[in-house]
UniProtKB/Swiss-Prot annotation:
Alphabetized UniProt keyword annotations: Chromosome, DNA damage, DNA repair, DNA-binding, Nucleus, Transcription, Transcription regulation
DNA-binding region location: 24-92
Family named by the database record: Belongs to the NHP6 family.
Membrane-spanning residues: none
Region feature Disordered, mapped onto this chain: 1-27, 69-101
Organism: Gibberella zeae (strain ATCC MYA-4620 / CBS 123657 / FGSC 9075 / NRRL 31084 / PH-1) (Wheat head blight fungus)
Protein's name in the database: Non-histone chromosomal protein 6
Localization, UniProt: Nucleus; Chromosome
GO BP: DNA repair
GO molecular function: DNA binding
Main location per the UniProt record: nucleus
Gene Ontology CC terms, in alphabetical order: chromosome; nucleus
A Pfam family matched in the record: HMG_box
């Protein structure tokens, strides 16, 4: 007669540190700028479409763009990345200042 399998151990979740609500928001990617701009167009062209299908269509449209068509979104993403880095640097300086006080 086969032995009973040992009871499976439950995986314990590691606790994440709470996010500071005052921390700067991460910069958006070029795709996210594109998706935010095109989402309503996709919904209007395909009424009744599910959330997942909207994402698939947006992904297909993004992949179909050439470098020239992606350039404005890449520029927005670069500017947003710079904004995030500047805000994060200022935020970290404030945090260090508070810790030393």
């Amino acid at each position: 007669m086969p032995k009973a399998a040992a009871p499976a151990k439950r995986a314990t979740r590691t606790k994440r540190a709470k996010k500071d609500p005052n921390a700067p928001k991460r910069g958006l990617s070029a795709y996210m700028f594109f998706a935010n701009e095109q989402r309503e167009n996709v919904r209007e062209e395909n009424p009744g479409i599910s959330f997942g299908q909207v994402g698939k269509l947006l992904g297909e449209r993004w992949k179909a763009l050439n470098e020239k068509q992606r350039a404005p979104y890449e520029a927005k993403a670069a500017a947003d990345k710079k904004r995030y880095e500047d805000e994060k640097q200022a935020y970290n300086a404030d945090q260090e200042e508070e810790e030393s006080s």
